[in-house]
Amino acid sequence: MMDSRILEHPHAQFGGSLGSMVGMGFPYHLGHHHVYDISGHQLQSAAAVPFSIDGLLNGSCSGSVANSNPLLGSGCGVNGDSQYKLGDGGDPDKESPGCKRRRTRTNFTGWQLEELEKASNESHYPDVFMREALALRLDLVESRVQVWFQNRRAKWRKKENTKKGPGRPAHNSHPTTCSGEPMDPEEIARRELERLEKKKRKQERKLLKSQNKLLAGELFHTPGSDSDSGVSQSTDSESTPHTGPQHSAHRQQTEHICEQHARHQRASTVNETAEPMDSTRNSGLCPANGITRASTLQKLNPFSVESLLADSSPRRKTILDFSQLPPQRPLVGKGHFLLYPITQPLGFIVPQTAMKQSHDSGNSGHHCSTTDTSTSNQKNVNHLCRDNTGASDELQRETKNSSIQSPSTSSEKCFSESNSPQKESENDSESTVTNSSQKESISANLSEYSDRKSRSSADTNTDGEDVDMD
């Protein structure tokens, strides 16, 4: 800001540098020949200090050192008294036509607001005399009273024309139809009732959905749920024909294993270590308490109300009953479907211990296991025992192949595979006759196999002696 005291000296001239300095805050460029070209009435009105910035910028205002800001006083006021008011801060409610000074916000006291409210209740449109009387009595400016009444009328119109509550979107009229006519109050009430009913139904659906989700989560974690059935009733039409034959084959295989277990219990009681594990395994596979696979097919969806309220015992036993067995891979997938088609019955693992050959021949009806007890080494021979009408031929081929195999693991796996499924209409007498004939053929083949093994061992010993003699 340039100090105006420099220009108070009577001999001060407008030089080039001074003209450039004045040009920063002055909109007109001043030069040496433009100094005295200002209009004559402005120079005469500013005769006291002819060359002051205030006199040049404000032709009608007298120069003053108190007003150090020439831009603020430019064109402001009609007489010189307005500059002294601006220097003191001025009256904020004083309206000057040429001054664009920002007005501060008027803060009304509680008493002033009460008096204004009383006046607005009497009349919404007070005349100028009433506004001036209120301004004198409330120590306000008449313009502020006028603005307050304008705002109060706008507030009243909004309140009268709008029926909105807190939080509702603002609308300034009653609900109307498409043609713009006002709606019937009964129609408005009916729509409001429909809106409330729709909101209530939505909340009920949300609550029911959350309950079903929670119930489904609990059923997935319960060990006794009926989710281990081979087929689910709520499947698609595409996957149903694939799962039906698999389930029927699985049922026939389970029945076949149970029949073998019954024959084995009647046959012999040798091999006491392997016997309890077979009975435990087969008891888990055989149907108990009248629960069959057919009843599982007829059962409803496991998530239905009937299946939830039914008192069903768990199908699978806990891991404590099978603690000495290796972990098994589940045959049922996540969507209760079989992971792969089963073409043979489910096998079970029989832990093998050191047994004599007599025990093996006595227990050959079910386990079909052979042990080579020679003085040099002991061999565990893995062979596949097939329980069908042509079992004798299959056994001879397997024994020939098994004599060449090297010593393998200490446990033998016996898989009973039925290539031709038994028919349900077969009589008990015929099945017992065929089983006895099969047992006789298997025992005869085992005796021939033992003789052949003894001869082969003798031949190998003589061959070894010949090599030593050479």
Curated annotation (Swiss-Prot):
Tissue: In the somite, it is restricted to the caudal half of the newly formed somite and sclerotome.
Biased composition (Basic and acidic residues): 252-262
SMART domains per UniProt: HOX
CDD domains (UniProt xref): homeodomain
Keyword Transcription regulation: yes
Primary gene name: uncx
Example of a GO biological process term: cell differentiation
Gene Ontology MF terms: DNA-binding transcription factor activity, RNA polymerase II-specific; sequence-specific double-stranded DNA binding
Organism lineage string: Eukaryota, Metazoa, Chordata, Craniata, Vertebrata
Gene Ontology CC terms: nucleus
Protein name: Homeobox protein unc-4 homolog
Annotated spans, Disordered: 83-102, 157-185, 199-289, 355-470
Cited InterPro entries: HD, Homeobox_CS, Homeodomain-like_sf
Miscellaneous: Marker of antero-posterior subdivisions of the somite.
Entries under SUPFAM superfamilies matching the protein: Homeodomain-like
Keywords: Developmental protein, Differentiation, DNA-binding, Homeobox, Neurogenesis, Nucleus, Transcription, Transcription regulation
Biased composition (Polar residues): 224-246, 355-381, 401-422, 430-448
Record family assignment: Belongs to the paired homeobox family. Unc-4 subfamily.
Subcellular location: Nucleus
